[in-house]
């Protein structure tokens, strides 16, 4: 429980109303009640703002006139919300306890205030920094290094010689450093596996979602740069480089040896081919199929939106005739000339 005045001081915001009101939890405008703090970041919700029963809201000066309760006025309510949610977050944190059923190699170096859960396995020559949390059944293979203040949640699998920076979060069932999809085909059609000798390097302040896989490099390293955000069920193939502060939404797949620049946003279910580059500050819409390099910043979209079945059928039928139509247009152009 926090006073509104305390929260405002943490947010560099200005209280409008009762600064002593007590805040117990966070809620949406429509669901909030006494003791709740809410937020409004979208003009679509001004009616909900005016009707909310929240004890306080996070808003900008521009919408203050629609607010009928206590408020903290600031320039970026959404960022303020993130900071308030950190205060109320009950996620596991390191407490220095190592479970008796954890298996830790004698050569591993464990920092101060590290938590290691039941049935977790820490391999030979692993280095774990201070204030690290390792959840139950996580596995950390030989030679891996994990920086300070990183959270490795339950059932995460980290392969050998991976490097993870400080302040990272890796969610349940993610797999980091598995073999990339490298095979050589013989003349008779049979496959020979190519050993994957590179590493995965995850820089500071990176978050990786549940069920995501990041393959180790074949020769060069796979690199996730500082501040990147990767959602659930994303596939990052070998030798890929993800730039600083770039975000990839769920079910996206990035094929091998592709480089994505800094500050990019990749929509969910996108498929990005291998051996291309995407420049800084690129936005790719959801379900897009990117087959060649992007060299100019901007917004790109390459997917069909859902349509009623009959309308879609007509569209496909017309699309099948487009070559014939182009030929006819060219013939007409020749006649006009």
Swiss-Prot record:
SUPFAM superfamilies: Trimeric LpxA-like enzymes. It is an enzyme of class 2 (transferase). The active site is at residue 238. Keywords: Acyltransferase, Lipid A biosynthesis, Lipid biosynthesis, Lipid metabolism, Repeat, Transferase. One of its GO terms (biological process) is lipid A biosynthetic process. It comes from the Bacteria. Its EC number is 2.3.1.191. GO terms for cellular component: membrane. GO terms for molecular function: N-acyltransferase activity. It catalyses: a UDP-3-O-[(3R)-3-hydroxyacyl]-alpha-D-glucosamine + a (3R)-hydroxyacyl-[ACP] = a UDP-2-N,3-O-bis[(3R)-3-hydroxyacyl]-alpha-D-glucosamine + holo-[ACP] + H(+). Pathway: Bacterial outer membrane biogenesis; LPS lipid A biosynthesis. This is UDP-3-O-acylglucosamine N-acyltransferase 2. It comes from Francisella tularensis subsp. holarctica (strain LVS). The lineage of its organism: Bacteria, Pseudomonadati, Pseudomonadota, Gammaproteobacteria, Thiotrichales.
């Amino acid at each position: 429980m926090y006073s509104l005045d305390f929260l405002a001081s943490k947010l560099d915001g200005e209280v409008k109303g009762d600064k002593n009101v007590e805040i117990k939890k966070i809620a949406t405008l429509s669901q909030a009640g006494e003791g709740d703090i809410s937020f409004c970041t979208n003009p679509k919700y001004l009616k909900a703002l005016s009707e909310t029963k929240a004890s306080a809201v996070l808003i900008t000066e521009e919408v203050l006139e629609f607010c009928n309760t206590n408020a903290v006025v600031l320039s970026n309510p959404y960022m303020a919300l993130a900071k308030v949610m950190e205060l109320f977050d009950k996620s596991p944190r390191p407490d220095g306890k190592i479970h008796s059923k954890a298996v830790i190699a004698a050569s591993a170096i464990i920092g101060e205030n590290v938590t290691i859960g039941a049935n977790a396995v820490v391999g030979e020559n692993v280095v774990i920094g201070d204030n690290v949390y390792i959840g139950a059944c996580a596995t950390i293979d030989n030679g891996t290094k994990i920086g300070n203040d990183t959270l490795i949640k339950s059932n995460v699998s980290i392969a050998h010689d991976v490097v993870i920076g400080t302040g990272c979060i890796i969610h349940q069932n993610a797999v980091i450093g598995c073999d990339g999809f490298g095979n050589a085909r013989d003349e008779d059609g049979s496959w020979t596996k190519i050993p994957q000798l590179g590493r995965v390097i995850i820089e500071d302040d990176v978050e990786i979602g549940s069920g995501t896989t990041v393959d180790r490099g074949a020769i060069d390293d796979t690199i996730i740069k500082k501040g990147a955000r990767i959602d659930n069920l994303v596939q990052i193939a070998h030798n890929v480089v993800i730039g600083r502060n770039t975000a990839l939404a769920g079910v996206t797949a990035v094929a091998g040896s592709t480089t994505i620049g800094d500050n990019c946003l990749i929509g969910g279910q996108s498929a990005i081919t291998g051996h291309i580059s995407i420049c800084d500050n690129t936005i790719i819409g959801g379900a897009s199929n990117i087959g060649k390099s992007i060299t100019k910043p901007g917004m790109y979209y390459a997917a069909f939106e859902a349509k009623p079945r009959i309308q879609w059928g007509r569209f496909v039928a017309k699309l099948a005739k487009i070559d014939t139509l182009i030929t006819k247009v060219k013939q007409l152009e020749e006649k006009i000339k």
